[in-house]
Regions:
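Long, well-ordered core segments of solenoidal/helical folds
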Residues: 1-2, 30-50, 84-110, 157-175, ...
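Solvent-exposed loop and edge beta-strand segments that line ligand/cofactor-binding
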Residues: 1-11, 53-67, 118-137, 148, ...
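Structural helix-adjacent loops and short alpha-helical linkers that scaffold large soluble proteins
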Residues: 19-37, 77-91, 143-162, 168, ...
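Structured, active/binding-site neighborhoods that engage oxygen-rich ligands
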Residues: 10-19, 57, 72, 115
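CBM-like carbohydrate-recognition segments
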Residues: 1-7, 13, 19-30, 42, ...
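Active-site lining segments of carbohydrate-active enzymes
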Residues: 58, 72-84, 91-92, 96-100, ...
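Alpha-helical scaffold elements that line and support the substrate/ligand-binding pocket
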Residues: 13, 67-80, 136-143
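Flexible, glycine-rich active-site loops centered on histidine and acidic residues
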Residues: 41-76
């Protein structure tokens, strides 16, 4: 179909591959196997210049959210099959997106190429909170999949540490990370999907010994307490920016499933930390 290559539509493969590892039912992984085989055997010739009017531009990881959605699937397929084609494809495509969207001065990811020359109200570059949260979350999934002695792991581990070191500097005094990482004054409301993914990543990093506990624990504790404050008595998580691509205003009434997912990922790491 027209979404055969689309990262958002392969992300569910992560869950099915995890289920296959638990239940050993081949029916759980065959659709993901077929899809990844097709993508690798028929690589897209598209550029990384995202254009929603051109579906071909969505065939590659041309927006930073995609680095959460698709690469972990290929990492898991590599570990399940021991077939190098999966890790070679992931490395090639991930590094192409990194080279294109990662700003080496700010050490943050642009959401996509449309933001290269845009500026926030305060004159800074546009770096989206949730977008960088997606990247950090995806790196966690890759690092949890590739063993520490795997030759392909170092690039992702180094990037995880670099991005974590930068992101900790951008936490608000209220404990949240905001929709705009460099212009929080223009978007002062909490944003819990970005905060959830970031707390998840930083907690994972500390738990795995990748990040210095003394340096990162204060930010983790502030971030987790902030997330808990955003939960209503009925369990609803508020302040989740709706589906989008750049910083927007957020209200307490706003919620989305990916925000809850990020909260649960963070909570899982906090629980491990407390045990």
């Amino acid at each position: 179909g027209k979404y055969m290559y689309h990262a958002d539509h392969i992300a569910v493969g992560q869950v099915f591959l995890d289920m296959y590892q638990k239940y050993h039912d081949r029916n759980m992984w065959l659709p993901t196997l077929a899809r990844t085989e097709f993508v690798i055997n028929h690589p897209s010739a598209s550029t990384l210049e995202l254009d929603y009017r051109n579906m071909a531009s969505l065939e590659r990881w041309s927006w930073c959210d995609a680095l959460f959605m698709a690469p972990p699937v290929y990492a898991k397929m590599y570990m399940l099959t021991d077939d190098w084609k999966y890790i070679e494809f992931m490395n090639r495509e991930y590094k192409a997106t990194y080279d294109y969207l990662f700003d080496k001065e700010e050490k943050l990811f642009y959401r996509d190429h449309r933001y290269f020359n845009q500026k926030e109200a305060n004159g800074t570059k546009v770096f989206w909170g949730r977008g960088n949260g997606w990247v950090l979350g995806g790196l966690c999934e890759i690092l949890q999949t590739l063993p520490r002695n795997n030759m392909h792991r170092q690039f992702y581990q180094d990037l995880f540490i670099t991005l974590s070191d930068r992101i900790i500097q951008l936490q608000g005094k209220d404990g949240y990370w905001h929709a705009s990482l460099l212009d929080p004054d223009s978007y002062p409301s909490p944003e819990t999907s970005a905060t959830g993914f970031i707390v998840y990543a930083l907690s994972y990093g500390v738990n795995e010994g990748l990040l210095d506990k003394a340096t990162f624990m204060p930010a983790i504790e502030k971030g987790w307490k902030a997330l808990v404050k955003a939960v209503e008595k009925n369990g609803k998580l508020g302040y989740v920016q709706p589906i989008g691509a750049d910083p927007k205003k957020v209200t307490r009434e706003m919620t989305e499933v990916y925000g809850v997912g990020a909260f649960l990922l963070a909570g899982n790491q906090i629980y491990k930390m407390a045990k």
